[in-house]
Amino acid sequence: MKVIKTAPLIPSEIKVLEKEGNRVKISLAPFEFGYAVTLAHPIRRLLLLSSVGYAPVGLKIEGVHHEFDSLRGVTEDVSLFIMNLKNIRFIAKALVGQDSSLENQSVVVDYSFKGPMELRARDLNSEQIEIVNPEMPLATINEDAQLNFSLIIYKGMGYVPSENTRELMPEGYMPLDGSFTPIKKVVYEIENVLVEGDPNYEKIIFDIETDGQIDPYKAFLSAVKVMSKQLGVFGERPIANTEYSGDYAQRDDAKDLSAKIESMNLSARCFNCLDKIGIKYVGELVLMSEEELKGVKNMGKKSYDEIAEKLNDLGYPVGTELSPEQRESLKKRLEKLEDKGGND
C-alpha cells in the first residue's frame, strides 16, 4: 500500500561484501531515492582528504646541503633519492593509536648503510618504523661508500607542501612535501533495492583500497565519524548569520586545486610530460579541456588515463565545468601562486 511519508527511511544494513588484503567492498542500505549519492560523495571526499597516514617531511643526509647535491658513492642524486623516498609508505609504530586531535606528532629515525648494496624500503624497518611496501627501491650504494641519513616522519592527513613544514624543521634538515593520505582508491556505485516490494530505494556499494598504512574498513568508519562530527556542530550551536564569500578559489573545497602536481603521485613519464609544458598545479589541469589535455605533446593514452584517474579521485574529472566566476577566481589564485613562487 502506498503511503505518504513524513520522515525518511533510516538505513539499517551495512555489510562487508569482499575483503582481500588492503581492499574492501562495503554495502549500505536502504536509502530513500536520491539520498544515496547525497551521502556517498561526501564520504568519498572525506576518505581521500581526512584519512590519517604517515609521511617523511624532513630529511638530513650527511655531507649534503640541498636537494640538488650529489651523493658521494651513491648512483642516485639527492633529487632521485627524495623521489624514491616519497614512494615508500611508513607506519610510525609509536604514533599508532595516539589521539589524532594532537598536532605535530612525529618521530625521528637515523640510518646508516655501507655499500655495496641495493638499498630498498625493507631496509628501513626498525623498532620505530614499519614499511608497508618493502620492495620499493631507494638507492644503490657503491663499494666502500657509506650513506648516513635521518628522517622526521609525521602523522597527518591530506597533502602538505614543503613550504608549510619548513618552520618545523631543525637545523640541517631539508623540508619535504608530505603526502599523508593512505587511500589509493575509493569509488562507489548506486543500485536500486526492494523494500516491501517497492523498488524505489537505493544501496551504496563502496570499493576502498588503501596503501597498507590503515585497514580500509577502519578508514571507512573513520571517515563516517568525521562526517558525523562535522554535521553535529549544527545541532549544538546556533548558526551565525554571516555573509557568504563568493571567491570560489578561497573556499575549502578548492584548496587542493592549488596543490602542486607532485601531490598527485604521478608516474615519472606523466610528471615529465606536464613539467615540460610548465604545468605546476592541479588547478591548471582542472582548467584544461579533454581535448587540450590529450593534445599535450607526448601525452599518450596511458598517461592521459593515469591523469584522468587521479583527477577523478580528487573529485574533478577531466573537463569539469566551472562557472565563469569560478574559472576566473581559480586563474587569479594560480597567478598569485606563480608570483609568490609557489608559496600560498
From Swiss-Prot:
Residues 1-238 are annotated as: Alpha N-terminal domain (alpha-NTD). It is an enzyme of class 2 (transferase). GO terms for molecular function: DNA binding; DNA-directed RNA polymerase activity; protein dimerization activity. GO terms for biological process: DNA-templated transcription. Its EC number is 2.7.7.6. GO terms for cellular component: cytoplasm; DNA-directed RNA polymerase complex. It catalyses: RNA(n) + a ribonucleoside 5'-triphosphate = RNA(n+1) + diphosphate. SMART domains: RPOLD. Residues 254-344 are annotated as: Alpha C-terminal domain (alpha-CTD). Keywords: DNA-directed RNA polymerase, Nucleotidyltransferase, Transcription, Transferase. The keyword Cytoplasm does not apply. SUPFAM superfamilies: C-terminal domain of RNA polymerase alpha subunit, Insert subdomain of RNA polymerase alpha subunit, RBP11-like subunits of RNA polymerase. DNA-dependent RNA polymerase catalyzes the transcription of DNA into RNA using the four ribonucleoside triphosphates as substrates. Homodimer. The RNAP catalytic core consists of 2 alpha, 1 beta, 1 beta' and 1 omega subunit. When a sigma factor is associated with the core the holoenzyme is formed, which can initiate transcription. The N-terminal domain is essential for RNAP assembly and basal transcription, whereas the C-terminal domain is involved in interaction with transcriptional regulators and with upstream promoter elements. NCBIfam families: PRK05182.2-3, rpoA. Belongs to the RNA polymerase alpha chain family. This is DNA-directed RNA polymerase subunit alpha. It comes from Helicobacter pylori (strain ATCC 700392 / 26695).
